[in-house]
Each structure stands twice: as structure tokens, then as C-alpha cells.
Amino acid sequence: TEGLNFRRAFREAGFHISGVCVWVKNSLVLGRSSYQWQHEPVLYGWLPNGKHKWFSDRKQSTVWKFDKPRRSKEHPTMKPVPLLAYPIKNSSAPNGVVMDLFGGSGSTLMACEQTDRVCRTMELDPRYASVIVMRYKAEYPDAPVHVLRDGQELSYEAVST
């Protein structure tokens, strides 16, 4: 597994690892390993000299049980919105900014909308960037949507055709 590489990268980026949470899925993720994974580790931490605030009670568990989405044609590793909403609510205040530099299918953006947070996300792959915009627009059809692409701000209509 890549667990040690992720921990090393987390530390090399200057973050303090406070712990590891575990997303327990309702089904296996088939692979080439003898034991098939039914969980994903989630590193939890913050910058050592940064402010660390907690917005929940002291009864939150490191074991997160959320159903894995069925296979998605939009994105191969789509995360369930409730999975992301859970730590977002615990780790940020309403109207706080949440950054996701790997936008994927837009689950973080959707979780932020549902929890009254502001999401700043990016996705390098144009296909997945389009998935994010279309997923958002399907859920919030009246919301104004603008996309920043190559330094230019574009309307939803310009990128959806």
C-alpha cells in the first residue's frame, strides 16, 4: 500500500499528523491483494504553528461508516457526500473556506454547499472539471456558476456546450 508514502508527503508538506481515521465501506474494493480492502485510511492533522479548532463534541470516532457509491461512470473513485460532510462540519465553521485541490467528482463542493461552507476547488483533468460543474448545476440549477479556465472566467453556458 501507499500509506507510508502518504504519511511522508504529509509531513514533508509541513503538516502535523494528529491521527488516522478509517472510512469503512459497505462493500469490498476488488484488487490484486490477498485480502480485499474494505476501508480507506484518512490522515488527519494541521500545520504545527497553525490554529487548530474543533467544532463538534468529544464523542466523534475515528471509524467512519458510510456506504461506498456504486460504480460511477463520471468518476472512478467518487466519494459519498456525507463522508466528506462529516469531517468538514467537525473541522470548520459555517461560512468557513474549505479547499480541495483534487476536485474529482465534486463531492467536497457538494458537501460544502450542504453544510454552509465555502468551497475552493480545482481539478486538472478537464473531463472531471466538467463533471463537477454539471453535477453542481444539476443539484442547484438556479445558482450562478462561473469556471476559471486558463486564467479566464467563463459562464456555465460557455463550458456546457
Region spans (language model):
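S-adenosyl-L-methionine
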Residues: 133-161
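Core catalytic lobe of class I
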Residues: 1-129
